[in-house]
Each structure stands twice: as structure tokens, then as C-alpha cells.
Amino acid sequence: MKYDLIIIGSGSVGAAAGYYATRAGLNVLMTDAHMPPHQHGSHHGDTRLIRHAYGEGEKYVPLVLRAQMLWDELSRHNEDDPIFVRSGVINLGPADSAFLANVAHSAEQWQLNVEKLDAQGIMARWPEIRVPDNYIGLFETDSGFLRSELAIKTWIQLAKEAGCAQLFNCPVTAIRHDDDGVTIETADGEYQAKKAIVCAGTWVKDLLPELPVQPVRKVFAWYQADGRYSVKNKFPAFTGELPNGDQYYGFPAENDALKIGKHNGGQVIHSADERVPFAEVVSDGSEAFPFLRNVLPGIGCCLYGAACTYDNSPDEDFIIDTLPAHDNTLLITGLSGHGFKFASVLGEIAADFAQDKKSDFDLTPFRLSRFQ
């Protein structure tokens, strides 16, 4: 059988692509080296932020607004356990923060619902938060967080119900191109398609070693908290920048545990074996202490944590482009630790590619040629 589309990597983007392409009537094969959702990539750990006023640059705003529409649609499949939780997101940092300046600019350009607070206003609204006098907060009322593993599980189930073929626990070992399309090699045999999407995440260089993607080991952890830090108490998700420039992110507490991670830093790695479990690097359990001690002093000890990986591009912007010399293969990689919130729209973009539809978005900033 020759498929219309083969998806290599069915985690965040691949699961979405499989669903949207199958729903569009294509004959699709989803593949993954493991059984998604799983612990081997960048999507585990239950939750991921979704921010609209984007500190990484306004080029992302049209994408994230479409992503939010798709998340809302997907959430209707799980109304008892919603995939998107509109907790709000407070972005904290020094008044001269470049990140916060980008957030404010994005909000102004796109007329987003963002409220600016000074230090006293932040601490009056959320007494659990402490910030210096020179800090400001930009509160995104309509943002929140996503249930990442539940989203992937839902997409995969919906795709399967729509007739999508799924080949999991079966790594792709090679990709071949010819005039007739794309062939992938696996331990289970060879499969052919008219087009392919490569969204293999951290280990995409195992298949395409020439790509400018660097895996980085990252950790996040859950710390002892109480009901004051919960969604029920209107405590928001957050990003926070310390005076030294370190960037943190976190979520409202659930079951008396608050999850937090450090966005910058981490350990450069070159193989899956180097991504050692949480606590095998001495600093893992204390990485969030500088933020907790200064901004959330009421949070208690580290309860548990997990390691994941970022697939960083050189400029930490996404790579969304066809494979050089092979216009029938789309790359979606280099998501650099801020990609999950876009998984829905990136999956839709992949499905449009498979149907020979022109994207509704300007993807020029994400081309591979910027690194040449």
C-alpha cells in the first residue's frame, strides 16, 4: 500500500498532524519509536503553558491564536477533563525586561487582553507572590495551560477512529526519496507515501544528521504547596525572570504540588543515554530554588521531578520547511522548549502541506535557509 502521508514521530506535532490529515480524508500512517504519549521526548509531565502575547516575538502570535482555536475545539472531546485550562498567565520580570517588552508589544499589535501591574499591584492580587519594587507583571487573562499527554492521547484515539494507520514502538531507521515519493525503513519493513512529515523531536538528527538541532537535557519538578496556589484560589500559571536573566515557568498547584521549571540552561547531550533521570545531576532538585526563595517563598521542598529534552535550533526559533532538494518532505523541528502550545496549529499546517494547500501563515521566519 502507498499512503498519502507518513508521519515520522507521533508526539506533540505528529499526533496532531495524524488527526487533522486523516480527518481531511487522507490515507495516513503515523509512526513513532515508542508508544505515545511517552516519557522519551518533550511532551510528558502532564502540563504545558499556552501564552498568547508572545515574549519570543510577534511572528508567533498568529500561530498561537489559531492554535488556541484548535485547542478549544479539541477540549470539547474531553469536557469532563478539559485539555485547556484558562487559568491566566502572569509574566513577571524587571521593568526593563526585553522578554516583557515583547509581550507588551505583541499584546498591543494584536489587541490582546493583557493587564499591566506594578509590583504592589501584583502582590495585592496574589499575596503568595513577592517581587522587588522594580518589577512589573503582564497578566494574560485568556491564557493558561494545556494537558499535554491527554492531548496527544486524544488526537491518537481520534485519528485511529477516523481510520489512520498507526505503527508505534517501531523506530524509523532511514528515509529514502525517489521520483515516486518517500520510503521509510523500519524494523517492521518498508512503507511508502507520496509525502512525509518529519517531526521526530529531539532525536531527529539520527535520521537527518545535517539539521542544525542541538538536544539539551532539561528538568522540571513539583514542590510542596497548598490550596492558596491552586486554580480554585485563582492562582495563575506564570513565567518569571530573575534579575540575572534566568527564566522560569510554572503552573498552579494540583494535589498540593506546584510544578516549576527553568527555561534557560540545561545540559547539552548527544544521545538518549545521556538524558539521565531526574536527580542524577546534582543541581536538579535545587534548580528552581532561586526563583522560589525570592518570588514564591511559601512553597516547600521538592517532592519529585522529571527530565525531558529540548530540541534547540541555533536561534531558538522553530524550523518549518521542506527538506532541501525534497519538496515532498516537511520538517517541523527545533521547537526549542516552547513548541507544545503550537502543536495543534503545526499539525494543521502539516495536514495542509499533505493536501498541497498553501499555508495561511507566513512561515518565512522559520525556513532552514536562515542558517546558511
Swiss-Prot record:
InterPro entries: FAD-dep_OxRdtase, FAD/NAD-bd_sf, Me_Trp_Oxase_MTOX, MTOX
A GO term from the CC aspect: cytosol
Modification type S-8alpha-FAD cysteine: residues: 308
Names of required cofactors: FAD
Positions bound to FAD: 4-34
Keyword Oxidoreductase recorded: yes
The protein's assembly and partners: Monomer.
Stated role: Catalyzes the oxidative demethylation of N-methyl-L-tryptophan.
Protein name per the record: N-methyl-L-tryptophan oxidase
Source organism: Escherichia coli O6:H1 (strain CFT073 / ATCC 700928 / UPEC)
